[in-house]
Amino acid sequence: MESTPTMQDHVRNAAPEQSATATRTASEQIVAEVGAWPGVVVDTGELGEVAFAVGRREIGHVHGDHAAHFSFPRRVWTELRADGRIEHHPVFPDATQGPAARRIASDADVRDVIELFRINYDRVTAARG
């Protein structure tokens, strides 16, 4: 019987000391990068998602290696949507601010998801002072 990976498995598997030839999954790459930013806490959410937070503010989460979800203010959401970087969140398909989704299907998507996390990280840390 195969078990679902835990947050500790993701963190352990994303350790920087892995050999250069080791292939990391999308979520392992994202956990390794975003989880290394000052003040970021990585945890497993109620639905098994890997969530990233600064203080009490979630900056986004990933569902396995295939999707990332975020929340952005209207101006940022509109710009990112116009640029094709985010889509409507599947639970909130009519939203024009707040919930957003990004599919992860390639290395370029992984890099952009990390950049989207950085947008929220910079926003949250700037607000905290």
Predicted regions and their residues:
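Generic structural signal for short, solvent-exposed loop/turn connectors between secondary structure elements
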Residues: M1, D43-E46, G129
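A general boundary/transition motif marking the beginning of the first structured unit of a protein
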Residues: Q18, A22, A68, A105-A108
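Charge-rich, low-complexity N-terminal segments
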Residues: M1-V31
